[in-house]
Design a protein with these regions (language model features):
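Extended, composition-driven regions rather than compact fold-specific motifs
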Residues: 173-174, 185-237, 244-262, 270-275
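Extracellular ligand-binding/catalytic regions of CAZymes and related secreted enzymes
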Residues: 1-7, 25-33, 41, 46-51, ...
């Protein structure tokens, strides 16, 4: 079994071979080839292919190739100016991820401390928060309306509590490995290709989820749909056009949206950003 990783010009960046054991008639054998990613890349971010060729006595028995996206760790590290003051209410160890990305932040124990005017934060991040009181929701809306910027990371319960007129619920997808951009021109996607919000890697043998949930949201001039996810295998039965539209809407949801309120903005994300230390797009 010969393997190679090649760039878009078919230049070999890394390669190797593995001996494949004999397979009995109608049998099956598995091996785990020792594939090394290239130590040097021609650019910070590169589209490559993993090519596999199985030969016996010089005769090719099988060939396969797989598209991959690889990047240097420096590509998305240190992208936030150190002078920006970022506060983090951390309920799911997001501080570790931000440290990896070299994003300086200060953790706080509560929403009240997060919104303390004396902190003069440029951005408030709420990560992994599942419970939010009515008073905390009111304080968050008040803070945002005065010009505050808030980022909700995998805090769907809290986000719905804060924005009940916009976020009506959520779905835990059975197929959460592919996310699609709704606004390709949004600055949040700078440096990311249109088809790259998928198959987020965490070096584990499991479905490579790109999102944890899809949000059901009302269309409104204050809501900007940035990215979404929908079931990719389903039957759309007959009926009136409006019935089919409703059926399609029931199978899709948002994974990234921005909400305007007064002078401020809030971004709500259900993307698997915790994979930033193993997936370059998740980190970006």
């Amino acid at each position: 079994l010969a393997w190679s990783i090649v760039d878009e010009t078919n230049k070999v960046l890394a390669s190797g071979t593995e001996q494949f054991p004999a397979v009995e008639y109608y049998g099956r054998k598995y091996i785990e080839p020792n594939i090394h990613m290239p130590s040097n890349l021609p650019a910070d971010k590169v589209n490559v292919k993993l090519k596999l060729t199985l030969t016996e006595s010089g005769v090719t028995l099988s060939q396969n190739e797989y598209g991959l996206l690889v990047a240097r760790k420096e590509w998305n590290i240190g992208q936030v100016t150190a002078s920006k003051k970022i506060l983090l209410l951390d309920k799911d160890h997001m501080k570790v991820t931000l440290d990896f990305l070299d994003i300086a932040c200060q953790t706080v124990p509560s929403i009240k401390e997060l919104l303390n005017a004396k902190q003069k934060a440029n951005l408030c991040i709420i990560s992994g928060l599942k419970e939010c009181t009515d008073e905390e929701a009111r304080l968050l809306r008040e803070y945002q309306s005065k010009g505050g910027r808030i980022l909700f990371l995998n805090s769907k319960e809290a986000a719905q509590k804060v924005y009940p007129e916009y976020i009506t619920g959520w779905i835990i997808p059975t197929e959460g490995d592919i996310v699609v951009m709704e606004r390709y021109d949004a600055p949040v996607f700078d440096g990311i290709g249109a088809l790259e919000l998928r198959y987020f890697n965490n070096n584990k043998r499991e479905i490579p989820l790109a999102c944890h949930a899809t949000l059901k949201a009302n269309r409104n001039e204050n809501v900007t749909e940035l990215a979404g996810q929908m079931r990719i295998h389903a039957y759309i039965d007959g009926g009136k056009p409006e019935d089919r539209i409703q059926k399609i809407e029931s199978m899709r949801g948002l994974t990234l949206l921005q909400i305007k309120d007064g002078k401020g903005t809030a971004t709500v994300s259900t993307l698997c950003t915790e994979k930033a230390d193993t997936d370059p797009i998740a980190g970006k």
